[in-house]
Regions:
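Bacterial N-terminal signal peptides that target proteins for export
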Residues: 2-14
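C-terminal motif of bacterial Sec signal peptides marking the signal peptidase cleavage site
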Residues: 21-24
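Boundary regions of SH3-family modules and the immediately adjacent low-complexity/disordered segments
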Residues: 26-34, 39, 43, 65, ...
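Short, structured beta-strand/loop micro-motifs enriched in basic residues and often containing a Trp
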Residues: 40-49, 126-138
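Conserved beta-strand/loop element in small beta-rich adapter and peptidoglycan-binding domains
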Residues: 53-72, 139-201
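Short acidic/glycine-enriched loop/turn segments that link adjacent beta-strands
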Residues: 74-77
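Short beta-strand elements that form the blades of beta-propeller/WD-repeat-like
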Residues: 273-291, 332-343
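A eukaryote-biased signal for long
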Residues: 313-342
């Protein structure tokens, strides 16, 4: 009897160990899932070995079926995938080259939130930077992919958030390790410790961006502000007068054309000069506050086609403005809408009418003002 009980206990232990093993393996990857290639180009290989053969080249945006995953000797995670080519090639690809369908779906939700908001500005990356699902960098869980240096995009909004304390993040430049790789932070920390410490900022700026498929399969996401260079159009960049341009839209743009093309790397180039509405913000050496306005002045720049020169059509008094900037109407009958903080601190919609006087000069009527036209004698 004792022998029978011992055998039964041993069998129960073996079954429990097998269940634990299977459960542990299932957490490595979700089977029957799909993913999209985020690398510009990558190879599906015959195995995870260094000497494995290349079976199929895939490009950014290609979809693959994820069947399993494993960890290589160097700690890199690899996915066993099936390609969507004619022969449905099966092989292995590094996990860092793949974005899961679940993450892509979350990025599409972000894009849907701002689908009706026109581009407020355009920008490009100063260096290779992470595209994230949320505006915070204390960890790597919200990283979707790493964007290449020089990547261009539309900016649809921005947000100031409390800056993480230095001990809460080792990614001061938002340069996180590749997904699936072993993190080795000790050397980085020692290097940072040898450098002079700069005063910690109390909060930091993040941009919410819209991206072309050629740049990222994820249509939207958040980028750490210090890695972004605003690409102010060459037509207006020399009209900055001590304040930074934070948003801009052409007033004479074809309404059937896209609001902003970011396919070309040099997104600051404009085909021809024109009239613009520009939102400005005063420069300051003081730390920015979380609740400060997005802009504090409106600048409308007209263009004289005959003399081929710009002129100031309107410059508002200082105000506390809130994005987004929306342009409405067609031809000479246009207006733009913003939000302005009132005395009670609540933003209220303000509509500015754009028109031309009898001499053809561009004018702007602020809310509550009538259009001023010069009577002909």
């Amino acid at each position: 009897v004792n022998t029978h009980q011992k055998t039964r206990k041993l069998n129960l232990i073996i079954v429990a160990l097998l269940l634990a093993f299977v459960s542990g393996c299932s957490t490595l990857a979700k089977k029957d899932d799909t993913g999209v290639v985020i690398a510009n180009r990558a190879q599906i290989r015959s195995s995870v070995a260094v000497v494995a053969a290349d079976l199929l080249e895939v490009s950014r945006g290609d979809v693959v079926d994820i069947m399993d995953s494993t960890a290589a000797e160097n700690g890199e995670t690899w996915y066993h995938v099936r390609g969507h080519d004619e022969v449905q090639t099966e092989g292995w690809i590094e996990a860092r080259n793949i974005m899961s369908q679940a993450v892509l779906d979350q990025a599409r939700v972000l894009a849907e939130e701002d689908k009706d908001i026109p581009a407020q500005a355009t920008g490009q990356l100063r260096a290779s930077t992470n595209l994230r699902l949320s505006p915070e960098r204390s960890g790597s869980e919200n990283i979707m992919m790493k964007l290449d240096s020089g990547s261009s995009f539309e900016i649809v909004g921005w947000k100031r958030v409390p800056a993480p304390k230095s001990e809460e993040t080792t990614f001061e430049s938002d340069d996180a390790p590749k997904p699936g790789s072993v993190q080795q932070n000790s050397g980085r920390k020692r290097k940072d410790g040898d450098e002079p410490k700069e005063p910690e900022e109390t909060n930091e700026l993040w941009y919410k961006v819209r991206l072309q498929p050629s740049i990222s399969p994820a249509p939207a996401g958040w980028i750490y502000g210090k890695q972004v260079e605003l690409t102010v159009p060459s037509d207006i960049i020399f009209y900055r007068t001590g304040r930074e341009f934070v948003a801009w839209q052409r007033l004479d743009e074809d309404p059937d054309a896209k609001s902003s093309e970011t396919k070309d790397k040099d997104v600051a180039k404009e085909s021809k000069p024109g009239s613009w509405v520009i939102l400005e913000k005063s420069s300051s050496n003081e730390p920015r506050k979380l609740d400060e306005p997005d802009f504090d002045r409106i600048y409308v720049l007209g263009y004289d086609k005959y003399n081929q020169e710009h002129y100031t059509a309107y410059r508002s008094p200082d105000l506390k403005g809130v994005l987004p900037l929306r342009l409405q109407g067609k031809g000479d009958s246009k207006n733009f809408v913003i939000r302005v903080q009132g005395d009670d601190g609540q933003p209220k919609e303000a509509q500015y009418t754009v028109y031309r006087d009898d001499r053809g000069n561009l004018k702007v009527a602020a809310p509550g003002e009538a259009q001023k036209t010069k009577k002909k004698k």
